[in-house]
């Protein structure tokens, strides 16, 4: 539960020394993680303030874009049926300072991270721009370069939320693969490792860790068996595609139909996109009613 509020709760979590992995699904810019729409509200007056704040912000944005403040105020008053006292202090320095603090409470900023001293070993930022290393500073860099035990971040340098599944083959990490080995299988141009690519979690004694350098299709076919973990099977399908295995399309369709594991079926969907034999169309029709929201979205 995000009590007492989202921002302070998350900052407390990333500071925990026993936290191995954090995965953020959020909006972002290089210097900010947008983690909540509104700060903590303890009373009904908080929502009254929020409504007025949003009206004032609308005026400020319009003025920055060259519009006349008075005409914008008149439009707002008319549209929402409010009185002028809701917004007439939009450019009052005291109100602007209060609104700035209110806005800051909705996101995690660079200085917030430095103060939190993150200890989470690995963080995945499924957000735009949080990993934009082209800037002088960015969220992902601040996690690993601040005091604390954070070692690696996976971040994006541009807009990617609609294009990327940040959980693809993540089970490889459970089996003891290094972060860099995992990212070699799933990386896209806009995603980056910031920190130590050799980092890995301790695997159990019965972990499965196939040789990523093996180029024999028969070797990888055995790992498509249901007796292996979901993402090892997904890795095997991925490697078979890379090795141009001739009978992969029917194997993908069969796996799609027989597996109830969402991430494995998502891997089948991704790979079948490369085949023009009718099987992709079959899974798309099934996918629009899939229990997994991301499969439904990709299918539509």
Model-derived regions, located:
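Caspase-like cysteine protease fold
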Residues: 166-254, 258-270
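Catalytic cores of nucleophile-dependent amide-cleaving enzymes
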Residues: 49-165
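Acidic, Ser/Thr-rich peripheral helices and adjacent loops at domain boundaries
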Residues: 41-54, 173-180
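Functional beta-strand-loop-alpha-helix junction segments that form "active/interaction loops"
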Residues: 1-24, 29-40
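Extracytoplasmic/secreted cell-surface and envelope-processing proteins
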Residues: 7, 30-43, 132-136, 162-166
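Long, helix-rich interaction regions
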Residues: 229-231, 260-264, 274-278, 282-300
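A generic structural motif
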Residues: 1-5, 52-54, 153-161, 183-187, ...
């Amino acid at each position: 539960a995000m009590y007492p509020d989202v921002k302070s709760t998350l900052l407390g979590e990333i500071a925990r020394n026993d936290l191995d992995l954090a995965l953020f699904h959020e909006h972002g810019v290089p210097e900010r993680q947008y983690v909540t729409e509104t700060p903590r509200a303890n009373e009904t007056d908080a929502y009254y303030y929020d409504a007025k704040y949003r009206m004032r912000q609308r005026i400020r944005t319009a003025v920055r874009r060259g519009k006349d403040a008075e005409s914008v105020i008149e439009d707002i008053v008319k549209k929402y049926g409010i009185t002028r006292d809701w917004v007439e202090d939009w450019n009052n320095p005291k109100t602007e300072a209060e609104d700035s603090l209110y806005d800051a409470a909705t996101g995690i900023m660079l200085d917030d991270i430095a103060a939190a001293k993150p200890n989470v070993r690995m963080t995945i930022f499924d957000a735009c721009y949080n990993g934009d290393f082209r800037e002088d500073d960015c969220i992902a860099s601040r996690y690993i370069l601040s005091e604390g035990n954070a070692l690696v971040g996976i971040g994006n340098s541009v807009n990617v939320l609609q294009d990327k599944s940040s959980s693809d083959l993540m089970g490889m990490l459970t089996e003891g693969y290094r972060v860099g080995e995992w990212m070699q299988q799933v990386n896209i141009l806009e995603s980056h490792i910031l920190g130590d690519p050799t980092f890995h979690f301790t695997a159990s004694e019965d972990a499965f860790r196939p040789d990523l350098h093996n180029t024999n299709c028969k070797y990888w076919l055995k790992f498509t068996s249901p007796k292996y973990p979901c993402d090892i099977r997904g890795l095997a399908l991925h490697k078979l595609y890379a090795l141009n295995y001739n009978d992969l399309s029917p194997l993908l369709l069969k796996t799609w139909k027989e597996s109830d594991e969402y991430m494995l079926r998502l891997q089948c969907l991704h790979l079948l996109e490369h085949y023009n034999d009718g099987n992709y169309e079959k899974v798309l029709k099934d996918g629009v009613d899939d229990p997994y929201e991301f499969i439904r979205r990709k299918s539509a």
